[in-house]
Amino acid sequence: MKILLATDGSESAHSAVDCLMRFPFPSDSEVTMLTVIDRAVFKNEELTDLNDEQQDALEETEKIVQEAAQELLEREAARLRNAGWSESSELRIGHPAEEIVAVAEQLDIDCVIVGSHGMGGIKRFLLGSVSDYVLQYAPCSVLIAKEPGLLPNESGETPTSPADDKHARPLRMLLAYDDSVPARQAVEFCTSLPLDQQAEVTALTVLPLITLYRQDIRQRLSWLWLEKKKQALAALERVTKEIGRATPHVEAQLREAADVSDEILHAASEYRSNLIVLGHKGKGAIQKFLLGSVTTRIAHHASCSVLAVRNH
């Protein structure tokens, strides 16, 4: 599997590296580390009328920033090498979000990993800018890495580092499933991962209710609704059998709610999930609306990492 890991030196990006090392990617995966220097910092329209001294200072600053970015790449790459990963690195200058998507296209990447917020000292919130753009336009799956906090292990002790945490708790995956083509692709992605015997997977389907004027009461009693529930349960049964080949700890949940994304978030909190997986809807106008109403909302509000799967 080809993985692109975008880093900017922020704590969030550092957590993305931790997430990569804890995530059950195939051991022969190839990782490309990418750092993008925002061209706008040095190509600002207000910086056009500079004297020679100011221009020299700007060029020196740009050189220092590039050297710092290269050092950052080398540090993070060393972490990956020490953990046994095969890696390479890329340093680009341009618009961060656009460069991430461009590199993903050029290198035929299978999964892009970005932090949930950061941008170094600027502390710019990524969701709503860079990661939103990557989530929308990347030609592949996108993993938005978050640090959900360290959970107590079996003995009730709290790990002191992410590395210890890896051994203290299993992967707890919540797979949001609606039997669509993207959802089935998400299942295929999950079953392709080398999940260990401790991994826990909950396949969740949420049927949307129309609560206006208590229409949900009539909706629940209609034969069409009962047929939808029957079909949803059958689809969940197929999914649990597929994932059951990868790990024995699989269960299915069928829920009904007026707000699908809220119910998914509630379930993730209830199950103490450390990863939510959804099928990616794509880039079209209608699909963009769906993406904004479910996937992006979950990416914004989930307390754990979110993987939006899209085959390319």
Residue spans of the language-model regions?
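Structural beta-alpha unit
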Residues: 63, 67, 71, 75-112, ...
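Aromatic/pi-system hotspot detector in well-structured domains
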Residues: 15, 19, 25-28, 33, ...
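A short acidic, glycine-rich active-site loop
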Residues: 54-68, 221-234
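Conserved beta-strand termini and adjacent loop/short-helix elements that scaffold enzyme active sites
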Residues: 34-36, 90-94, 145, 204-206, ...
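Aromatic/hydrophobic pocket-lining residues that form π-stacking "cages" and hydrophobic walls in ligand
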Residues: 20, 76, 100, 134, ...
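Small/aliphatic-rich secondary-structure junction motif
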Residues: 1-56, 166-221, 242-248, 253, ...
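Gly/Ser-rich helix-loop-strand patches that form or flank binding pockets
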Residues: 2, 26, 102-155, 159-160, ...
